[in-house]
Structure formats: structure tokens, C-alpha cells
Amino acid sequence: MSSMNYDSYMKKLMAESGVKSTLEILTMKSLFIEMFFDEQKLSSGTAFLAANDTTSHCALITNRHNVTGRNQETDECLSRLGAIPNNIVIHFHKEGSIGEWHKVNLPLYRENGEPYWIEDPLLGKKADVIALNLNWGSDVNKLPYYMKTTLDRDNLYVGPSDTVSVIGFPFGISSSGKFPVWATGFMAQELLLITKENPVFLIDCRARQGQSGSPVVAYRSGGFRKIDGDKITSVLSAASKWEFLGIYSGRINNESDLGRVWHASVIERILNAAEKDFQDRMTKSKENN
């Protein structure tokens, strides 16, 4: 995203709204997705791109139940039509044209029926997180969350009752165009209580259907707390700061605002598995040719 395009778009928005403000980069990172069976739309949700660093491939990250069309716990079909999706439409920002979107349609299954998506190598289908596709055209604006740089993960301290935001599309609603809605709630536990076998934590947030697959971030302006070795320090800053925490996957039940978030460490594992799968297929393709 060029600074010139961003600056001109900001001037346009401020002129139209009469409000002097800015468009947060995190608003640009959440992507509206729609799941289809052939031409029939079944559902909508949220996704985002993730990459290890600025030099690595980026993959689309969303919930497994979004692409399977099935309840993670019961395996029941989620659509009232009794169908499961076989393709997904992703609304990307157009490259070089902020405020315009480009739809990319991807199949979910190979010709042999094997899913295109990659699951967690440790937990498999138990983890409600998948990665899809590593190659994107030059016509889409790629704005990933980075797993292994301080751009999106800088050891900010986030404790119980601290605010966190779920940035997605509740009921398919957007704030404008295909820009997402920020739903903000609170951490409902300590992050250090997660494990490799159960890398899920709870938040207390009024998130709803359509926000499944949303990035969950601790966004701070004016100041933040940071883990520095074995200490927690307070930092005052005029610039906004955030910590990417994981991916939202829905409420624990319909009567509660407690929601599950799969920790960023799961996304790291899946990204590495997706990269390995991509390289293996590239090598096999070269050998066959």
C-alpha cells in the first residue's frame, strides 16, 4: 500500500465526513468472506492474511468451521439448506486503490476431493483454524499480520479485564464498503494458562455470527504495558500500538458473551505447515515436468 494512495484516500474521507482522523491499518487487515456451494451462498464470515515476516508467503487464515460448513463439536451442517461450501469468495482491497475491493474466488477442494486448506499439524481438525492459499495475484493488496516481527507482536502485556477487539463482520455488516466493525470486550482469563494441547483463551465480548475468523487484537493508544524480560513496564506513546492475540471462533453457547480465541501460536504452526506443503508440491511438480 503506497503512502501516496493512503494519504489521498484519507484526504477524501476527511473532506466527505468533515472529521479529522485516520484509518487504522488494522481496519484494512480484516477481510469479508462468503462461502458458496456452487452459485448458492451459504454463509459469510471474516478472514485475514498472516505471514511469518515481510519476506515470507502470506496465507488466508479463517476458522475451520467456515470452510467445512459444519459445527466443530457436533459435525452438524451449519446451513439451513443442508449444503456445505465448495468455494469461497474473498473481498480483497484492490492494489493501488484504497476504498475499492476485488473479489477472489477460490475452490475449497481439489479434483480428488482433498481439501485445499491446511490444518494444524499438532491438533488437526480439532483446531478451528485453517490456512488457505499462498500465492496471490498482483491485483490484490496484501496486508498480513506478521507472526515473527514486532510489527504486530511486540510482547505487550494483556491481562484479565484488559480490553481486546474483535475486528470483523457481524451478520455480514460492515462499517462502510467492506471495512469491518470493531467489537471491543475484555480478556476473561490469563494468557499464560493456555497450553500447546489447548491453545484457546476466553474473552468477554458481544461478538456475533459473521465474526468467526476475525483477528483479535489488544489495541492501545496513548500508552501500553510491555513485557521486558521478567518485568512489566509502562510506556507512554503518542502513536497507537497493538498486539495480535489470535483468531475468534465463536461463543461458548448462544446465551453467553464468552467467546473462544485460538492463540497466535496455532497460526504460526499452520503457516509453517502450509509453507512446507507448498514447497513439497512445487518440488513434486518440477520432478513430474
Task: Report each predicted region and the residues it spans.
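Cysteine-nucleophile amide-bond enzymes
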Residues: 5-10, 53, 107, 117-123, ...
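N-terminal targeting leaders that route proteins to membranes or the secretory/organellar pathways
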Residues: 1-20
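Residue-level recognition of beta-strand microenvironments
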Residues: 50-52, 190, 219, 250
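A conserved glycine-rich beta-strand in the N-terminal activation segment of trypsin-fold
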Residues: 40-59, 258
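C-terminal subregion of chymotrypsin/trypsin-like serine protease catalytic domains
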Residues: 7-11, 23-26, 218-289
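Serine endopeptidase catalytic core focused on the charge-relay Asp
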Residues: 28-31, 43-44, 76-198, 204-205, ...
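Short beta->alpha transition motifs characteristic of CBS
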Residues: 63-66, 168, 246-252
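Structural detector for hydrophobic anchor residues on beta-strands
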Residues: 43-45, 60, 183, 244-245
